[in-house]
């Protein structure tokens, strides 16, 4: 596979047709994955990355479930996970028995346990962590369901010692879920009551933050509105602490979202795959309650060329390298690593495979879609149109903002 920046990725396979090596070349060679090994069941048993990190996989002989996963790097074992299961292969525990790292180093020992009800729904989870420099943490999670298998409650309690700072941090949340009562809407989430806290002291009700999330949907069941309200300590409710609005097309694809005035727009190809996302801040100035001016910035964008490449404003791009469906490398590049400015192609190739495409018109149409989305959300649009499409300038969105550069 040859990427647009001309790096060539070569995949090597063993006699059984299984991938065993991934090599990249651009000016010099580089082994992203040096070796992959398999057992007679074609399950992965060994993986070595270019940085020398090695992963070993072992499976139980009867049901071939992952039993142990060990990662070694730099002569140290940084992960040594052991897994246990119940009779129907639900995970019961995951224990990382790696050694506690040296002072100042990340990592440590972790243990998680999981409990299920008679219908194999997760009802309880616990976990502990022990790291360097007296770092410890523990959590408990409890889940509740009704007879229609809907989640009705979720509660988590967390305690950390010397993890984010020297001292103890207590945090947690208690979520209560309410669903629609009308026929056809009983699996639509209507409200979530969110009581949470974060304190260095002993938890008490005075530390609680009381939020409520209310949800609205269109006729197709797409989420169109989320309102977050908060009850203050004096008992008075702030009805609109935050809100989110969403716009969908006739094929139930998300076209735009408005998060408290921050508008994001989305485009798709003929197969329904997302190809472009644009976003930016919007500022307005009012004098004596009268609008005096504003600025809308839509320079932030992500261009999803394929699962292997994502381009962003300013000529930055990220390319992804996979082994099968597992992404193993993400590399960030810019104009220098690309070798040229890919936007500097007049009309972006208006003559392709005998087809003539008027990209000026398409560019203007996309700009109008952005304006229409702002109008849908009643968010003022004060952007400065960049109509100079010649020599690719229409792609640059250079409005002088830091995002554009």
Residue map of PLM features:
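Short consensus segments that form the blades of beta-propeller domains
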Residues: 102-106, 132-134, 165-168, 204-206, ...
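Beta-propeller blade signature
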Residues: 113-117
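Short loop/turn microsegments at loop-to-beta-strand junctions
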Residues: 8-9, 33-34, 54-56, 80-81, ...
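Short secondary-structure transition motifs
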Residues: 78, 139, 144-192, 233-235, ...
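Beta-turn initiation residues at beta-strand->coil junctions
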Residues: 1-13, 21-28, 40, 46-55, ...
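Extracellular/periplasmic ectodomains of large secreted or surface enzymes and adhesion receptors
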Residues: 64, 72, 83-85, 97, ...
């Amino acid at each position: 596979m040859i990427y647009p920046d001309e790096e060539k990725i070569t995949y090597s396979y063993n006699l059984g047709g299984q991938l065993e090596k991934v090599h990249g070349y651009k000016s010099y060679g580089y082994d992203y994955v040096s070796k992959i090994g398999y057992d007679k069941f074609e399950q992965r048993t060994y993986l070595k990355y270019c940085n020398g990190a090695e992963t070993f996989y072992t499976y139980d002989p009867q049901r071939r479930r992952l039993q142990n996963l060990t990662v070694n790097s730099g002569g140290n074992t940084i992960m040594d996970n052991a897994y246990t299961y119940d009779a129907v292969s639900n995970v019961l525990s995951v224990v990382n028995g790696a050694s506690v790292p040296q002072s100042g180093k990340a990592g440590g020992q972790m243990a998680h346990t999981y409990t299920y009800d008679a219908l194999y729904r997760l009802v309880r989870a616990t976990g502990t962590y022990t790291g360097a420099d007296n770092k410890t943490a523990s959590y408990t999670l409890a889940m509740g369901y009704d007879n229609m298998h809907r989640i009705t409650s979720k509660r988590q309690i967390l305690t950390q010692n010397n993890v984010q700072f020297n001292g103890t941090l207590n945090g947690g949340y208690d979520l209560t879920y309410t669903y629609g009562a009308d026929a056809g809407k009983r699996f639509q989430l209507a409200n979530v009551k969110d009581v949470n806290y974060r304190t260095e002291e002993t938890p008490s009700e005075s530390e609680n933050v009381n939020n409520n999330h209310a949800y609205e949907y269109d006729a197709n069941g797409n989420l169109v509105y989320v309102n977050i309200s908060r009850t203050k300590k004096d008992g008075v409710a702030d009805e609109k602490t935050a809100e989110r609005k969403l716009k969908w097309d006739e094929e139930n694809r998300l076209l735009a979202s408005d998060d408290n005035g921050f508008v994001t727009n989305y485009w798709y190809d003929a197969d329904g795959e997302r190809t472009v996302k644009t976003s930016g801040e919007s500022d307005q100035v009012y004098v004596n309650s009268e609008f005096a001016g504003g600025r809308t910035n839509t320079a932030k964008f992500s261009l999803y060329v394929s699962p292997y490449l994502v381009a962003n404003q300013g000529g930055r791009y990220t390319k992804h390298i996979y082994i099968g469906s597992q992404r193993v490398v993400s590399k960030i590049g810019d104009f220098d690593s690309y070798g040229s400015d890919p936007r500097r192609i007049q009309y972006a190739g208006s003559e392709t495979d005998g087809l003539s495409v008027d990209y000026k018109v398409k560019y203007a149409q996309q700009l109008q879609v952005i304006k229409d989305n702002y109008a849908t959300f009643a968010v003022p649009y004060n952007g400065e149109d960049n109509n100079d499409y010649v020599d690719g300038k229409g792609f640059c969105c250079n409005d002088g903002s830091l995002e554009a550069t």
